[in-house]
Amino acid sequence: IRDSYYIPDSILLIGSADKTEYWKDANALEIVNTVVERMNAAGYTRTDDKDTANLGLQLSYVQKVTYFVGYDYPYWWWYYPYYWTPGYWGDWAGWHYPYSVYYGYTAGSLLVEMMNLEADQESGKKLPVIWDSFIGGLLTSSEELNQQRTVDAVQQAFDQSPYLKK
């Protein structure tokens, strides 16, 4: 399907444990569904088959302060086991930016990343991120307010990116 995308029904948790964990409750699904609604409204079609999708979307929630070293290092994911598993999308070794980038994400941050799944699939190639959104400052003492702020911020990320429309 042309202009199709794949998105999991869960949110990757970063900094929560020494193993990969996912956020899968009703709140997580509301956030995922907000992204789905906005992608569909922009003219894309969701597919359950990541092998036929043109784009992949990953949502990640930072539970504690996290620092990523440089994306230019070819095996950076070895230093942060909570992030992408290298074979998730296929033969790609992982995604990267074409230059050295250093980030410090604070607790309560949501990352939304769109990957080009039609990139060169030769073994060892990087999966390119073609759009991303960093949403910080989501934590308050109210879980209900945190959830509403997160959903509103996802809406705002798409509002600020009108070029995503087909």
Model-derived segments and spans:
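A structural "domain/chain start" motif
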Residues: 1-30
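Extracytoplasmic
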Residues: 2, 39, 52-56, 105-109, ...
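Soluble periplasmic/extracytoplasmic beta-strand elements of cell-envelope proteins
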Residues: 4-8, 56-60, 111-113, 131-134
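Solvent-exposed loop/turn segments at secondary-structure junctions
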Residues: 12-14, 62-66, 118-119, 136-140
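Sec-exported extracytoplasmic/periplasmic mature domains
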Residues: 36-45, 62-65, 158-163
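Short acidic low-complexity segments
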Residues: 43-53
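Surface-exposed short loop/turn segments
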Residues: 59-120
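C-terminal/domain-edge helix-coil "capping" segments
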Residues: 102-130, 135-166
